[in-house]
Amino acid sequence: VTGWALALPWLALAGLYARGWLRLRPRGRGRLADGRRAALALLTALAYAWALQPTRASAFFLHLLRHGMLAFLAPALLWSARPFAIVLWGAPPALRRAWAARLGPTSPARGLARHPLAAGVAFLSLYLLPLDPGLYAWLGQHPAAQQAWHHGLSWSAVLFWWHALHAAPRWKPRPGTLQRVIVPLAALPVHTGVGVALTFAQSPAYPDVPVAAQVTAGYALWVLGGLTLTWAALRPLARLIGLEARKPALALPRGLPEAER
C-alpha cells in the first residue's frame, strides 16, 4: 500500500452530495446515518481513494480486489443511493444550470447516457485491459498510464451501473424489466470467464506473482463481481414479484356454488 489518492472530482461530488443531503434532510431528525449506511459509505470511499503498488507480488491480491471494487461494488453502492438529484440540490445555481444544459435534448452526453450498449462496451474493454499480463506489467512501469486507466475504469463503471440499476433521472425512458435484467447479465459471462481463467490457472501468468496469489485474486474477483451482477439482475425481478404479491385478489362473482370458489 503506497498511500491515498484522493481525486479532486470525487471529492467535489462527495461535497455536493453532502451539501444537498443536508439541505433535503428533514430538520430535527435524529442521527445523521445508521451504522449500515456509514459502513457502505466508507467502503465506497475506500475503493476510490486506495492507492496500491501493483508490481509487488504481495499486493497482487489487493490490487485485483480494488479493481473489483472499482468495477462492481463501489459504483453499485453509489447508484443505489440515487445521488443524482441530491448532488443537483447541493450544487450552486449556476453549476446546476450548466449541468442542465449539458443534459439537454441535443447533448452528446445525454445521447451516451441513453445507450447501455455503448456504456457496457466501454466498461468491459477497460475492465479486461490490464488482465493481459503484458499490459499489466506495462501499466506497472508507467504510473501515469496506470492512474489514467484507474480513472477510466471507475467512470465507465459508473456509467455502466447507471444503466444496470436504472439510476437515471426522469428524462431517461424507463426500461422494461427484461432490459433491466439483461444489462447486468450481459456482463456476467465475460466476468466469469476472467475469474475461471485466473482461479484454475496451473502456471503463473503475471511476472513476479506466485500461482497461489493469482488463484486467490481470481477467486475473490470472480465472487465479488459475480455476486454484484447477479444481485443487480435479480433486483428488478424481486421488485416485480413483490408488486404482484401486493395486488388485491380478484373478487369472485356472487352466486357461484361453493365447489367452484
Predicted regions and their residues:
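Alpha-helical membrane segments of multi-pass proteins
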Residues: 1-261
